[in-house]
Structure formats: C-alpha cells, structure tokens
Design a protein with these regions (language model features):
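Metal-cofactor-dependent catalytic cores
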Residues: 1-164
C-alpha cells in the first residue's frame, strides 16, 4: 500500500525540510511559505506531491535530489507516478482528501540540482497531459485539498476516485 514517506515545509524556496506532522488546510500545510505566489500556492496548488521512486530515478541519473529537495510537501513511497492521473482523488491518512489538479511545470528554482534537471523531469508530452511520457510525474503533481486534517509520515494513501 502506498504511504506518506515525508512531509515538508519551508520559509520559501527549496529544499523543503521534514516535519513530524502536518496540519493540512485548503491552502496547504500550515507553516509552509511560497515566495512567488503568482506561480505557486493557492487552492488548486495547495500541495506538491512527488514519489520517492521518481526521486530514486533522478538520483540514478546523477541528480543530487532527496525528499524535499524539489520543493514537495508530500513525498510518497509505493505510489506509481505512471498511474497517477489528473482528477484522481486520494485519502491521505485518516482525514485528508486530495484531488490531483495539475502537473508541476519546473522553474529555475530547481537549478541547484543541475543545469539539465528541468528537461529531465518535464517534456512536451507531460505539458500536453500525456501520461505515456517517461517523465510523467517526475516534477510532481499539484493537488487541491478537498478535506483538511492532520497528516503524518507513514500514513496510508488510498485511491478514492479515478475519473479516467
């Protein structure tokens, strides 16, 4: 079963640092700050979710990434990024419900991890919403919080609805 590996926040920018529990609100994790509100945050981008398996792929390709490095609030383990689709709804832990709303389009914030990382995690197929891209989900998924609540590392992740 997929689970929450790490929860993370920052005062803006990357990396986000691990926390032991999260108060998840409709606008994200309490205490998390986004510097550029024009492109980050808001109800449809309340959280950024990235799979640990995707991070492992990037590490194997030589990028010095780790949970929280790419700015994600929620790092998962056991969730197949290739099966995640826009519109899917998940329960995280006992209380939190989310909906996948948007693919994350990487920006210059990721430059510390290598000059080619943006191309390694995102391509025209991802931008067009085609999950067959080998880069699908590597940059992460933005989510909307449908049901706020408490969340902890180790909490299960359950698919509730799949509109596909």
């Amino acid at each position: 079963m997929p689970t929450v590996l790490q929860l993370a926040i920052s005062r803006g920018g990357v990396p986000k640092l691990p926390i032991l529990e999260a108060d998840v609100t409709p606008l994200g994790i309490a205490g998390d700050v986004q510097k550029n509100r024009k492109y980050h945050g808001g109800p449809n981008q309340a959280l950024l979710l990235i799979t640990s398996e995707g991070l492992d792929e990037l590490k194997a390709a030589g990028y010095p990434v780790y949970p929280g490095a790419l700015g994600e609030n929620v790092t998962t383990v056991g969730l197949d990024r290739r099966q995640v689709r826009l519109g899917q709804r998940y329960r995280l832990g006992a209380e939190v419900e989310i909906e996948i709303t948007k693919m994350r389009e990487p920006c210059r914030t990721l430059a510390p991890y290598g000059p080619t990382i943006q191309k390694a995690v995102y391509d025209p197929d991802v931008k067009a919403g085609r999950p067959e891209s080998p880069r699908w989900g590597l940059a992460g998924f933005y989510v909307k919080v449908l049901q706020p609540g408490r969340l902890y590392p180790g909490d299960p992740i359950v698919l509730l609805a799949d509109p596909c």
